[in-house]
Amino acid sequence: DTMRVAFILKSGMLFSIRRDELAQFRLLRLRARRQPYYVRDAKDVLLQLLDIDVEYSADIIEGIYDRLDTFSKQVLGSEMSDDTAGIVLSGIAVEEDLNGRIRRNLMDTRRAVSFLMRVKLLNEQQNDEGRQILRDIDSLDGHTGFVFDKLNFLMDATVGFININQNRIIKIFSVAS
């Protein structure tokens, strides 16, 4: 599940507005405790949170790839029943929704990092980190695009198999009548 988070950077402090605790915040706290000077100021905290979020997005995309591989084997394997096709279509819809939310999250993160860099709020080291985050996002954009294409292919193939199954049933009834 996804959750919207708003950040306010004011007077050297970072405020986050969110409904619940997120794993990204826990991971940042853990890293900060284990590595002295991991974050030195509020802008470091914000950049690290954005970077961790991009890492999480990459992990989720990897999970989508794994599930799509399973769907591909079901769709392109042996004959598929209408019930199996329905389950596959439902799974594809879930993955499409998740991929869309990841894509939107990456877009929001890109806008936030670009804004911080454009208004010159970051020092040179932070700008370097911002550029790396943007490169990571660019890389993930290609993956989310591929996932959308793969989802569309699997959906079309599944619907095609449903049509073939329905045509067989119609032929049986035509011959019987």
What do the predicted segments below correspond to?
Residues L134, M155-T158, N167-I170:
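Generic hydrophobic alpha-helical scaffold/packing signal
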Residues D1-Q125, R131-H143, I172-V175:
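Peripheral, non-transmembrane regulatory/ligand-interaction domains of membrane transport proteins
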Residues N165-S177:
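Bilayer-spanning, highly hydrophobic alpha-helical transmembrane segments
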